[in-house]
Swiss-Prot record:
It holds the Pfam family TmcA_N. Keywords: Acyltransferase, ATP-binding, Cytoplasm, Nucleotide-binding, RNA-binding, rRNA processing, rRNA-binding, Transferase, tRNA processing, tRNA-binding. It comes from Saccharolobus solfataricus (strain ATCC 35092 / DSM 1617 / JCM 11322 / P2). GO terms for cellular component: cytoplasm. PROSITE patterns: GNAT. It is found in: Cytoplasm. This is tRNA(Met) cytidine acetyltransferase TmcA 2. Residues 458-608 form the N-acetyltransferase domain. Catalyzes the formation of N(4)-acetylcytidine (ac(4)C) at the wobble position of tRNA(Met), by using acetyl-CoA as an acetyl donor and ATP (or GTP).
Length: 770
């Protein structure tokens, strides 16, 4: 144990060493007189660095928070006060000092985002009066006023375990200076005979970036090609991508006489801002005179020169756009379905994404992506960046952050596959205190999802209504894991809130059913929502996920639960997994999730009689909503997902009557007399009849169903439908003809050889014109 003076002296030495070796230090303060210590640490840091750049994270609307911020701001001339809710807009910045006020809220995503903004030689200060008491995010996880604190206990334990961290708590000062090794600071290394312009290479900050810039020339060669660039946060991938675009424009100019067009897309224009900014920097270094268009939010929208245009285009529009190259930044956030369409529509594609880190896609995305590209037989180059730019490799705070937030969790390899499978109800307190088990179970969960959030672990460990189920083989070899949230049994007041459009934390599935199906009885039922279910990568597609789901369903039934359900992004493969296990789609959001790039879906497998009745009604309402609004609300929904939704709700049906006039016009279409455009109303009616028919024991081919959905129900352009089916307009037309021929024959025994023309009596006898 040391006294305050000795403690501060060790901090001074650590700051000097950190500056020399380009690593960061962190000070954690948790005590009632926290603010006095914060001010003392700031004074100490100012003696070390007189005019630092500062990022200050806080909750501006909380009582007293602005006063604390203003007091601290007086110490500095370069000061960014950052509302945690808007932290993503500062992710490209770097600071000497990062201060995180966690008095009002302790939330892992805020720690993950802002700690990484500190540069080597810099300092991070995290301060609070109490890590658990009166915290906004913790309150949102509570159920019936109850919550655990397993996550916070583990977080504090990790502070004590790692180096480069100095702790001021209620009773003592605990210095943990860094004694490890770091790699030298990243430096550029311009290739001796570069393929890209030397001016572009000179703008890089690391040898890693130089390597990436050269790698982008892979896209200049013939045939369909993709480049996949992955990196943890802080490696400079967006900067390298932007500089590479500038270099490619210069190389393309040497080859092409016509104007060059390159499209950049991302979940938002803000997400693409770094790519566009560094492309501008690179083009200016090449001596280009640029016309720059900026969005209302201040982000670069397009760069135009005499012979080229570089433009940000929203994801859906980018699919149908044209140009030499499509750049997809933060590709994992847009999902595999989107990338599939992009690879069908574009000849040259660069996919850039974060792996690991607080917003990383982890290995699941890369695994799905590798399968997708292999199935298309596209030439691909995989490039990974490892050298951090903001700080030295070996930085102790990065090591602590990844461990504390489990940003690099990976499952262990399964052992003892010949042993008996054991279904386990996992004790969360034991799990939080056993890093090997926690990494094994949580690692399985995160590797199965494209996009992960550090908050997920806190919700799982602290939520008293969140349970963990797993299958293990032997003593400690986990092969499948599941996180369950208990939902339902809502009060009348919560039901009224939902019916009036209000929202509340938790109870996701009851909320959606109340809002969209309007049946209040569902709110009183007990349900288990499966938040995540996953299988170790080596054992996927072998039935273990279905086996775990079966065990969970049987346990729920035995405990008197009314339903088991789940909500997830509308990925075709994931949706198919739930459907084949007896789950019924009951809701799809009318809006895309902007961060995850797809439409959230709700599926339920009912247990009780009342749940079964409500689920059937919900499935009917969903089918009606889809078939009535695919041309509008769900115009951008993947047709393959629509097909699964429609064909999996055959438990509900409705009779669609088609008039003799419509049928007669459709015969003319089959005879080649009436073109598609003139017969579209009849084709549309027959399509509705087919998808509403829950009693048929036959089906069209998958391609025929897809073309009816994309062209007839969604009203997509011929070019888009051709892209979806990797075909051409002639073949698409033939598929429509084939499908309508079958429907006319099956339902009405009519063919292209049937007679055309009606009498008034024929029409009046149909009883549709009385």
């Amino acid at each position: 144990m040391v006294n305050k003076e000795q403690f501060y002296d060790q901090i001074r030495k650590a700051l000097e060493d950190g500056n020399t070796r380009y690593y960061r230090n962190l000070i954690y303060i948790e005590r009632d007189d926290y603010f006095d210590h914060v001010k003392e640490i700031i004074s100490l840091f100012l003696n070390f660095k007189s005019n630092p750049s500062v990022a200050y994270g806080f909750v501006p609307w909380a009582s007293g928070s602005k006063e604390r911020m203003r007091t601290i701001k007086e110490y500095f001339s370069k000061f960014d006060d950052i509302d945690y809710a808007n932290a993503e807009y500062y992710l490209g910045n770097t600071y000497d000092l990062v201060i995180l006020d966690t008095v009002d809220n302790f939330q892992p995503i805020n720690i993950g985002r802002l700690v990484d903004l500190a540069r080597g030689g810099g300092l991070i200060i995290i301060y609070t009066n109490n890590l658990i008491k009166d915290k906004t995010f913790r309150t949102s996880i509570m159920r019936n006023g109850l919550i655990l604190d397993e996550y916070e206990k583990r977080f504090k334990r990790k502070l004590y375990e790692h180096e480069g961290i100095f702790i001021i708590d209620v009773n003592e000062y605990i210095p943990k200076p860094f004694s490890g090794n770091t790699m030298p600071k990243a430096e550029k290394k311009v290739p001796r005979n570069p393929l890209m312009p030397k001016e572009i290479h000179e703008l890089s900050l690391s040898e890693d970036q130089n390597r990436v810039i050269e790698s982008f020339t892979y896209l200049l060669s013939g045939g369909q090609r993709a480049l996949v660039l992955t990196a943890a946060r802080g490696r400079g991938k967006s900067a390298a991508t932007g500089l590479s675009i500038a270099g490619l424009i210069e190389k393309l100019r040497e080859r092409k006489e016509k104007s060059i067009r390159i499209i950049v897309t991302a979940p938002s224009i803000a997400s693409a801002s770094q790519v566009m900014s560094f492309a501008k920097l690179g083009l200016e270094a090449l001596g280009e005179e640029l016309s720059v268009k900026v969005s209302d939010t201040g982000h670069i929208k397009s760069l135009r020169g005499d012979y080229f245009k570089l433009e940000y285009v929203p994801p859906d529009a980018a699919i149908e756009d044209e140009g030499e190259l499509l750049i997809i930044d933060e590709a994992a956030a847009l999902g595999i379905n989107y990338i599939d369409l992009a690879l069908r529509a574009w000849k040259k594609v660069a996919l850039v994404t974060t792996v690991h880190g607080y917003e990383g896609s982890n290995k699941a995305f890369l695994r799905y992506l590798r399968r997708l590209i292999e199935s298309k037989r596209i030439r691909v180059k995989w490039v990974n960046m490892e050298q951090p730019l903001r700080y030295a490799k070996g930085d102790p705070i990065e090591k602590w952050l990844y461990d504390a937030l489990l940003l690099d969790a990976e499952p262990s390899e399964p052992q003892y596959l010949n042993d008996t499978m054991i279904y386990e109800d996992v004790d969360k307190s034991e799990l939080a205190n056993d890093d090997n088990r926690l990494r094994a179970i949580y690692g399985i969960m995160v590797t199965a999802h494209y996009k992960n959030n550090p908050d997920d672990l806190m919700i799982m460990l602290d939520g008293i209504h969140h349970k963990i189920k797993a299958i293990r083989i032997g003593e400690n070899s986990y092969i499948a894991a599941c996180q369950i949230a208990e939902e339902g049994e809502l009060s009348d007041n919560m039901v009224d809130i939902a019916l009036k459009g209000g929202t509340f934390d938790g109870d996701l599935i009851p909320d959606r059913i109340i809002k969209h199906v309007r049946i209040k009885d569902f709110a009183k039922l007990r349900g288990w929502r499966i938040v995540r279910i996953a299988v170790a990568p080596e054992l996927q597609d072998k039935g273990f996920g279905s086996e775990l789901l079966k065990m969970i369903y049987e346990e729920a039934r035995d405990k008197g639960v009314d339903w088991v359900g789940s909500s997830f992004m509308s990925d075709q493969k994931v949706l198919n997994f739930w459907i084949k296990n007896g789950f019924i789609p009951v809701h799809i959001s009318p809006k895309k999730n902007e961060k995850l790039g797809d439409y959230p879906v709700v599926v339920i497998r009912p247990i009780s009689d009342i749940a079964t009745k409500i689920v059937k009604i919900s499935a009917y309402m969903l089918k009606e909503k889809l078939l009535n609004t695919l041309h509008d609300v769900y115009f951008n929904m993947n047709p393959e997902v629509v097909r699964l939704m429609l064909t999996s709700t055959k438990i509900v049906s409705k009779t669609i009557n088609v008039s003799p006039i419509i049928l007669d016009k459709t015969i003319s279409f089959l005879q080649g007399v009436s073109p598609y455009e003139s017969s579209a109303d009849g084709i549309h009616m027959l399509t509705l009849k087919y998808f509403w028919d829950g009693e048929r024991d036959w089906s069209l081919t998958q391609d025929e169903e897809l073309v009816l959905i994309a062209k007839v129900l969604q009203g997509k352009p011929w070019s888009y439908v051709s892209t979806v089916l990797s075909s051409n307009r002639t073949h698409i037309y033939e598929l429509i003809y084939s499908a309508i021929s079958k429907l006319m024959k099956k339902y009405y025994n009519l063919t292209a050889d049937s007679k055309v023309g009606l009498t008034l009596k024929d029409v009046m006898n149909s009883q549709q014109y009385d």
